[in-house]
């Protein structure tokens, strides 16, 4: 019995020792232990075709992602982790051509993102992220736009989040 208690104490000691001083990581997230805040500046819409709700939708979605997936506090400016960016492309193009017309159309959204990690500058990046969704050309963009934009935004936010704090 004493041997069992001794082994159990040893295992607990090793676990506590191993966990101290490490970055916390869950759901594949790797954030410096001293990071307490994140700030997200409003994404500017510089695309030639403008969706009036898109800037706010992207900015809010990125904040929501950090709020739901981390313990960081969202602040207006100068966070330990900082994001800013712009919408550089919002376009529709034909992807599959049928007899005399396009059979499928593609909505593409491209973002240019700048990320600053004040606690670990090796994680800083400036990068473009682009995602698309296809839809049947028998429908207008107005009929499918809200759903497609939501799908594309979710994928873009996942990409941005993973690039900044992903532990892959």
Residue spans for each PLM region:
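Sec-dependent bacterial lipoprotein signal peptides
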Residues: 1-19
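A broad detector of the eukaryotic-type serine/threonine protein kinase catalytic domain
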Residues: 12, 43-48, 92, 134
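Surface-exposed short loop/turn segments
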Residues: 68-72, 80-124, 128, 132-146, ...
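Short, glycine-/polar-rich solvent-exposed loops and beta-turns at beta-strand/coil boundaries
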Residues: 31-32, 75-81
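Compositionally biased, intrinsically disordered linkers/stalks adjacent to structured regions
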Residues: 146-168
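Second-shell loop/turn segments in exported
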Residues: 44-51, 139-147
């Amino acid at each position: 019995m004493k041997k069992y208690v001794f082994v159990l104490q040893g295992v607990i000691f090793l676990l506590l020792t191993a966990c101290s001083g490490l970055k916390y990581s869950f759901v594949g997230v790797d954030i410096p232990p001293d990071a307490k805040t994140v700030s997200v500046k409003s994404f500017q819409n510089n695309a030639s075709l403008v969706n009036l709700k898109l800037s706010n939708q992207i900015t809010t979605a990125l904040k929501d992602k950090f709020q739901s997936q981390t313990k960081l506090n969202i602040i207006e400016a100068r966070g330990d982790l900082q994001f800013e960016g712009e919408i550089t492309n919002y376009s529709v193009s034909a992807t599959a051509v049928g007899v005399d017309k396009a059979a499928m159309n593609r909505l593409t959204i491209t973002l240019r993102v700048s990320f600053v990690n004040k606690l670990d500058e090796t994680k800083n990046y400036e990068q473009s992220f682009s995602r698309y969704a296809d839809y049947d050309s028998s429908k207008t963009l107005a009929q499918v736009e809200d759903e497609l934009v939501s799908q594309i935004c979710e994928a873009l936010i996942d990409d941005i989040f993973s690039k900044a704090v992903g532990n892959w």
